[in-house]
């Protein structure tokens, strides 16, 4: 399954270049009620994706037909694997070849209409796999089949959302010719390519550490580092999810050219992000040794905790400012950010190689250098650059860094003060201790980070969700 997904990942590199900025361009024109231009982008993306599907369809079919000549597959499961690849590619071609229906919830800032069905289809996928594997004769292609069915359901949900929320967006034929603009495609691909380059920089920052560790320090050290990254990885995923939730609001306010509301919403989003993100930071720093002692009792829990802390230390400064990464795509300045990402990635790799080769701090260097380089880039480029791009003073967002640091330090201090009375000898006790720290951290953050108006906004949102 992983190998099949890897082939789709390679194909997605092409699709990403066209699609990664589509929602931004469509949203701006739609919010400004320039529906004709919004539809021009909407249609151009669709026809561009359709061309990609047609181009990739033949190689995909040839790969599946001649799979045994391309990779080593045991003959007794050859047809299983071919069916698996077929369903994986089917899901890819369906999601790519259909119109950009997921932009409907983005344009109207109704991501909840996508998140809830996504969770439900993920559960449905698990149920389908469980039933197929228990009732029927087990086959590996069931995994691909379940994924393809979930993709179809997701497409239907997205189609309904787009039709309901943005009825002005539709695929159009002018005089039986597709509504498509080469200029729009060049604009979309030009910006999207820089997003792909930014991903290269991100890979240099965090995607090569295990390889470097393996090459210089050996497989054992790589295994230790890999274990230590499990919690930081979840932190990174959590940060990305939170930041993406605020992206539509940012683009909509930018399209309306309402600088006052734009700044108000950004500062509020930064504070809410800080409220949420600093709690797991404190949890990892305080209870990380308990977690690793339970998860991998044969390993050095203290070492794993230190390596994890080195990986997340930057979030103590920037967890509240993570949403500023959305600014680059909002104002279409992705080129500048991509260059900064690649430069910082190259610097990180070079410094890591030097320290790992010529000092005794190799393992700590691999875990911590990228964090330090990331922090320097954020402080020297991301914060001042995003403020200037939005028309504010370069230091506009720096006070939030101080608030985030204060919140992190206070929660960590409280955590260590109560740690002696917190149990951690079993998973149930660890969950209980983490819950205690989480509740205390949430209460402290709500009153430390948020002002009275922001607290009313937060409580109102909670009551609104609970009342549904």
Labelled PLM ranges:
Residues 1-12, 41, 140-145, 183-191, ...:
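Interfacial/gating helices of multi-pass transporter permease domains
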Residues 16-32, 107, 170-171, 228, ...:
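Helix-loop junctions and terminal segments of transmembrane helices
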Residues 46-71, 131, 263-319, 346-354, ...:
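Alpha-helical transmembrane segments of multi-pass membrane transport and lipid-handling proteins
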Residues 86, 116-169, 229, 342-349, ...:
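Hydrophobic alpha-helical transmembrane segments
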Residues 93-120, 130-131, 141, 309-344, ...:
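Membrane-interface junctions at transmembrane-helix termini in multi-pass inner-membrane proteins
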Residues 121, 146-165, 179-252, 271-272, ...:
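Transmembrane helical elements of multi-pass membrane transporters/channels
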Residues 140, 144, 158-206, 249, ...:
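Interhelical loop/hinge segments that connect adjacent transmembrane helices in multipass membrane
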Residues 171, 388-397, 412-468:
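Membrane-proximal transmembrane or re-entrant/amphipathic helices at the cytosolic face
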